[in-house]
């Protein structure tokens, strides 16, 4: 038998808390600034576009450990723990004594780590009484993750995807729609910002999707 390459936790070993590194940093990052007031962003500022609990966690610099809600952790068990893989071939190619590992996130339903955050965000939105979520996405991974999470927690989802990316990766938007999301190429005429952009540069509305 060759050396062990994959290391996988059992379901009952999946962490029960998220780690907030800011709490342990001696030199903490500069605060986010409100673009209107130029003052440090408050939880109330962020809560205008994100749910309150995630806004609070985003600005928390005191608590190192945050409990993972049990419904979120339960959803994690469907695809976590993802394998931790020892990259022996890369170590050999680099001729290094260091041990190199990578996390294989391709085994989860959406193929990226973004579902981990999307599930938590949609859970908190549901708990706070939100009925629908709206997001942007570039290549489509985040849009797919949020669409899936919204479906899990009974929310409606609207996704605005960069129009050229939507054209180049048509199956990503198909995945989002499979989970019940509405998907629109951006810029579009359905938003004020999109109308302004297309008015200034009309050819942007001609990209086929």
Locations of regions flagged by a protein language model:
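PLP-dependent amino-acid enzyme catalytic core
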Residues: 1-207
């Amino acid at each position: 038998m060759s050396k062990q390459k994959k290391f996988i936790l059992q379901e009952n070993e999946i962490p029960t808390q998220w780690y907030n590194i800011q709490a342990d940093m001696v030199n903490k990052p500069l605060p986010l600034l409100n673009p209107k007031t130029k003052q440090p962003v408050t939880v109330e500022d962020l809560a205008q576009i994100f749910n309150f609990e995630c806004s609070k966690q985003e600005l928390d610099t005191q608590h190192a450990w945050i409990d993972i809600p049990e419904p979120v952790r339960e959803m994690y068990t469907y695809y976590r723990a993802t394998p931790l893989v020892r990259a022996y071939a890369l170590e050999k190619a680099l001729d290094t004594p260091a041990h190199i590992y990578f996390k294989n996130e391709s085994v989860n339903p959406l193929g990226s780590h973004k579902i981990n955050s999307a599930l938590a965000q949609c859970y908190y939105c549901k708990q706070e009484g939100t009925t629908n979520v709206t997001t942007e996405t570039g290549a489509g991974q985040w849009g797919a993750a949020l669409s899936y999470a919204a479906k899990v927690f009974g929310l409606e989802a609207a996704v605005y995807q960069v129009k050229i990316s939507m054209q180049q990766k048509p199956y990503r938007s198909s995945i989002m729609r499979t989970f019940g999301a509405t998907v629109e190429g951006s810029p579009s005429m359905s938003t004020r910002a999109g109308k302004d952009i297309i008015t200034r540069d009309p050819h942007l509305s001609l990209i086929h999707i």
